[in-house]
Amino acid sequence: MSVAAEKVREILSQNILADGFDTIQDLDKSHGSWIVDERNGKEYLDMFSMFASGAIGYNHPRIVESQELLGRVALSKPTLSDIYNSDYADFVRVFDEIAIPDYLKHAFFVEGGALGVENALKTAFDWK
């Protein structure tokens, strides 16, 4: 199911404050730092990179190449510490190689900043 680009703002404004940019992003045609408007094909230079969440740009070849893997692992809760899978083990192995310093032996994954702070406080209280 898909909504026609011409109807996007009308539909969104029924349930949300739809006061964002007038552009309707074409998720398939946007590329690098360019947002393509689905209605007319016009390209706009993205000067805010989705507020830093899109720092590598749109449809980066390495992300597109890994789309199947990303879709598959997105169905699994990455912070679940009781059920494991091989993709999670591969991620932790690579993360250990490039991001965990020798003086820290363990990692604790959460799904956001506020949850990270909350769990850091819980850990501090438990291990005081």
Protein language model features and the residues they cover:
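Glycine-rich loop-to-alpha-helix module at the N-terminal edge of alpha/beta enzyme cores
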Residues: 2, 14-15, 43-127
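Generic secretory/membrane-interface signal
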Residues: 7-8, 31, 40, 116
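Short, flexible, glycine/charge-rich loop motifs used to bind or transfer phosphoryl groups or to couple energy/partner
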Residues: 23-24, 97
